Amino acid sequence: MGTDTLLVFVILGVTVALFVSDRLRLDLVALMSLLALLLTGILTPPQALAGFADPLVLMIAGLFVVSTGLFQTGIAARLGRWLGRAAGTSEVRLIALVMIVTALLSGFMSSTGTVAVMLPVVVSLAWRARISPSKLLIPLTMASLLGGMMTLIGTPPNLVASNQLVAQGMPGFGFFAFTPLGLAMLLIGLVFMVTVGRHWLPSRAPASPGGEGEGQPSLAELAEQYELPASVFRATLPDESPLVGRTLQELGWPERHQVQVLAIDTEPDAVRNHRRSRRHLERSKAIGPTTALEAGDRLLLQGQRSSIDEVADAYELRVEPVDPNAEGVVPRNLGFVEVLPTPRSRWLNQTLAELHFRDRFGVQVVAVRRDGATITEGLARLTIRFGDTLLVEGTRKAFELLRRERLDAVVLADPGALEAEAPRAERAPIALAIMIAMLVVMTFAWVPNVVAVGVAAVLMVLTGCLTMDDAYRGINWEAVVLIAAILPMATALEITGGLQLAVDGLVAGLGPLGPFAMLAGLFVLTSVASQVISNTATAVLLAPIAFQTALLLDVSPYPLLMTVALAASTAFATPVASPVNTLVLGPGQYRFGDFLRVGVVLQLLVLAATLLLVPILLPF
């Protein structure tokens, strides 16, 4: 082994270790790897930067734009509303329909975008059917990953595998080359989940909403879910109260006393007719840090009795306990929803204060659930992370503002989730026509795939299906930069002999056992790697190895590359294996073992199906 080869393996090892550690962003790690290859002289600048001009990278960026166009025009949301009408209350039927609709969408949209659309719909359906969302959300994520196996554009690993063939002067996979195998995998996953898998899923998330058919949990249920005190009290401000004129921000009760102000109401008009104000006439509305208190205000407070008494004594308040679920206690125009930031949300790595949450949306964050723990103190200074679940209080009008932030957040427990209109719903027929035209052109290969995707992406903007700002925000830049920066690693392995060394080792170990053993080995290696690092990075690193292995064994590279593509999409077994798993972690109140228990079995089933079907459809 030469010095350059050893150096490349060291850089690759450090890169993979940083991927697994999750200490740094994946795209940053890939760029660091690229710079290391440049600084050590292993790659020349043109070789190192070739990934950014690769048609694969440009095509994936274009597909994100097309997917965002479908998202913004509500194509996916319409399917979700149909699901709401057709699903009924049967758990088996719900699981089956959720998986079918989700897989269909993720065959043409990104899996993350699909889950972001379907998540609030599925949670609302679960509550309507009195079923725990935990029973439906893992099937949702698995269907999104299985659906990505059904078309060439379903997931980046499919494109990576096809691009490997094209780069070697061979025809790439056709648009529907993945469809028979993808449908078979979906059927296997569907049968497994409705017969066995659903019994292994927990019923941890609350199953019953606050009212019949509301699809929204009650205050008491949310208090239990977020480990908040369920005791609710009403305190009235006397005319001489020292609190009059002070704002909630000045008081700082959540931080100082662990007491939340849920709402501000007034005494009946007949009693305080002489002190009517705009707020009194409205009876109640959402409140925020700048809300100033007035004499006669009635505050709806939540907290432990001892904390409430502490506040009452300190500020001379008259306090009485109330039933939070009694009619009229919590004003009708106020409610609670859970909000999740998306993987590409602009909220990430910012505090609630920096986001001006109350000023922008007219809501207040009551609690944040992170890594299974509830945070109620210091919320204004809390930095938002992907995977957080925010418990938000506000009016339905405010929730509508939140729901419009489709690229930044997913709103759960919202009664309007099933009826919500997309911001550009009137452009849906145009977006659908563009999508169909792109598929036809790619199927018949009239122009290169990258051209078809590029034209479709531009047409989405020109026809008003989305704006250029939406297009830029819709692109998963982390994935694009990751692919562009990691592709040269394959070049470095090839020119230093590292690729041949890896292939020789794989062939020496599994070659004597035949091509089926090689398929199994590649599947296991790819599937295990995809649980801990990006499935796209896994495919980029293993596709060249699969191709060279096929040449050394004197077999067709098509079945081996298809196996790598399929295995890269089996990120079922851990909550961090894929962004879609992380997205449902909070709403489903899942634990690591929930994914492991169901995911490993499904991986084994997909492995068995791959070994059976791939050699039949793509002979050696």
Model-predicted segments: where are they?
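Juxtamembrane and boundary regions of transmembrane helices in multi-pass small-molecule transporters
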Residues: R128-P139, G147-E221, Y226-P229, L301-Q302, ...
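Interfacial loop-to-helix junctions that mark the boundaries of transmembrane helices
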Residues: M1-D4, P46-L56, P171-G182, A422-R424, ...
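Membrane-embedded alpha-helical segments and adjacent helix-loop junctions characteristic
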Residues: L28, S33-L35, L39-A129, G189-P202, ...
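Alpha-helical transmembrane segments of multi-pass membrane proteins
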Residues: V92-L104, I131-G147, F178, P515-V528, ...
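Structured cytosolic domains appended to multi-pass membrane proteins
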Residues: A230-A422
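Transmembrane alpha-helix interface/packing and boundary motifs in multi-pass membrane proteins
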Residues: T15-L24, V101-S110, A143-I153, V440-W446, ...
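Core alpha-helical transmembrane segments of integral membrane proteins
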Residues: V20-S21, D27, G387, R424-L501
